[in-house]
Every structure is written in structure tokens, then in C-alpha cells.
Amino acid sequence: MNIAAASRDLPALFRPKQRLGFNTRVSFNDDDGPAQGLRQGIELFRQAERLGYQSGWAYQRHFDHYLSSPLPFFAAVGQHTRHITLGSAVIPMRYQDPILLAEAAGTTDLLIDGRLELAISTGANGAFDAVFGTVDTDARTEAKRRQSRFLAAIAGDVLHIVTERDTGAPAGAELRVTPHSPTLRSRIRQGSASLDSAIQAAELGIGLISGTVLHDQAEGETFGQYQARIIDAYRTHWLRIWKTTPPPVAVAASVLVGTTPELREKYAAYDLERRTAGIAASRPKGALAPAGQPVGALISPVFQGTPDAVIEAVLSDPGLAAADELVLFLPPAFGLSENIRLLADLATTVAPSLGWKPASDNQGPEQAAIQGSRPPA
């Protein structure tokens, strides 16, 4: 792989990108079926690692043509890769059993040598209550309750001391989640779409990843301006609460580098579709279209064009400038070869000008994972 040398100085407020990642939905269509989609998803992670990407993320979505259960998928990917970190972006906590999720996460992390990074969210979407069951509070409050329980479980906290008779454990036994991965909690992030959720992440002492949809912005505020404000609030609150250096922040964005006229035309068409259809853009055949876009939501721009045009656009965007890690959001309907081309073109023509260096072949998982001064577990 030929990586172009950076040929320009970075703007003063632009943070060099410590890591380069990608976010895929591991989608499938009605023609090829889910098995092929899953196998191609594994191959995508293999190729990304070959290109020097430090992280790969998969989106979770229930009842659709996308990955519904990321952890067994990551366990499989881990057997085909060596050092790229594997992350969920994101797992909504509203419909998760926190103890079962902690058990599955610990098992997966140990199987893949400590490369798991889980981004979780506490969004207020209760769209599937009819399937998963209703609760006696609102969706966001319930999601936060489950998030708290999950974080305690993966930290190795005692969840219960047995006092009951005729149970599966002796009286006085302290019940903790096993198998326990001691460092996993330090690799949990909050998927943040608002200022409040970023502040909550800082209060909980977990990392932050910002995605392609934001809400609760100020009037007249652009996506990049609001994203930068969210990141700044996270770092400010982290420093105030923990008195340590905040962990690196990741930002997912559509950065589509057109290295040929045909690719530029294709990416411009996707840009137009995203600006007109919003979150419903780029759906694989048979996938469900959202009933509507969240009221007041901001959709991230698509950074597309020639390599030089993309570099200039990324360098001037406040949100991307504030991030430590750039995560390429892959259009959901794109196929394996199209996605590999996107990964390769970003890594070879644009990312070096953002201060990024590819992972080396001998890089271990502890080096590939996010580094920061975390609070005590």
C-alpha cells in the first residue's frame, strides 16, 4: 500500500488524527441473503486492517437487513484479524439485558485479545416496545438505568450477595459477571447525539463517539459547530470531574474521496440523496425505510469530491477538527468492492494530510485501542 506523505501544515485548531476507522452496517440484500452479507463484513474488516486502519465499527439494527447482534460477529472477525479494534456504534441500551450483554461482551473481548470497543447509547427511541416489552418509565430513563447496571457488571462489581435458600449458589456467595475482562470498561464509549449525552459520558467516565445525526442544537448552529461544542463540553466536564486527560474522541463522518470522475459522480449522487432523504438514504434492497426523520435533527454533511477538495473541507470543519479519530461512515447500500475502494482511497490520498499514520503489522491490541487517562474503574 502506498501512503502519500502529508504535504501541508495542519491548521492550529485541527487535531491530528491518531486513529482512522470505519463504520459499517454489515448490510445484506434480498438477492444475496444474510450469510453472504456477514461473510463480506468479515472480509471488509480484514481489508481495512491490511490498509492500516486502527478501528472498525458495526452498527446494530433490529428487524432489518443489517447486523442485529454485533458481539458474535466480532468474535468471528477477531479470528480473521490481529490488531484492529472492533467496536459497536452503537448498541441502544433500551432493549438490552445489561447482565447478559456484559457476559457476552466479556466473553467476546477475551476471545479477541482485548480489542473490543463498545459504544452504547441511551436515546429515547421506544419503537420496538411492542416486541421487547413496555416499561413503567420513559425510554431514555430506562436506557440509562440499564446502562448503569451494565457498566457495573463489566467493571466486576458485586451484583448480588446470595441470601436465598435453594438457589444455584451457596448463601453468602458474591455474584459477579464471568468471564470478566479487567480492562473492558476502559473501552466503553457513549454514542453521543447531543450536549447532554456527552456530559453524561464524562460524568460516567467513559469515552465518546459522535455520529452523523445530532439534535438539540442552538438556532442557526451548523452540524460541525454543534459537534465541536459537544466535544468541548465533554472534555471540559471530564477535566473538572476526573482531573485527568480526557480520552480521545471519535467522530463518524461520510468522507468519500473521488479519485476518478466516475467515483466523484457516484459520491455526488449519494450526497444529494442524503441531503434530500436524510437517514433513509442508501438502503439495500429489502431494507426498511424509516417512518420519518427525528424532528429537529441535524444530518451530517457528506465530504465528497477530489482528494484536495475533501482535504480542504475536512480541515475546515469544526467537528472533524476537534476529533482525535476519524471514522468513515460507509453508505449502507454500497457493496464490498465499493467499500474497500472507499477505505483505500481515504487511507492513501487524504488521511495522511490529516496527521494520520497507518497501523504497523506488529502493533498489538493495547496500542490500537484508544489511549487516555481514564478514571479508576
What are these regions (language model features)?
Residues 2-16, 138-177, 219-323, 357-376:
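An alpha-helical appendage that flanks or caps ligand/catalytic pockets
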Residues 55-77, 92, 212-224, 327-338:
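Glycine-rich, proline-tolerant flexible connector loops at the mouths of alpha/beta enzymes
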Residues 20-24, 56-58, 86-89, 116-120, ...:
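Hydrophobic faces of well-ordered beta-strands that scaffold small-molecule active sites
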Residues 52, 60, 77, 108, ...:
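Conserved, mostly hydrophobic/aromatic
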Residues 24-39, 91-99, 183-192, 256, ...:
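Active-site mouth loops of central-metabolism enzymes
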Residues 1-84, 368-369, 375:
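N-terminal beta1-alpha1-beta2 module of alpha/beta enzyme domains
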Residues 68-91, 146, 346-358:
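Alpha-helix-loop-beta-strand connector modules within alpha/beta enzyme cores
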Residues 13-36, 95-162, 208, 216, ...:
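Flexible, glycine-rich active-site loops centered on histidine and acidic residues
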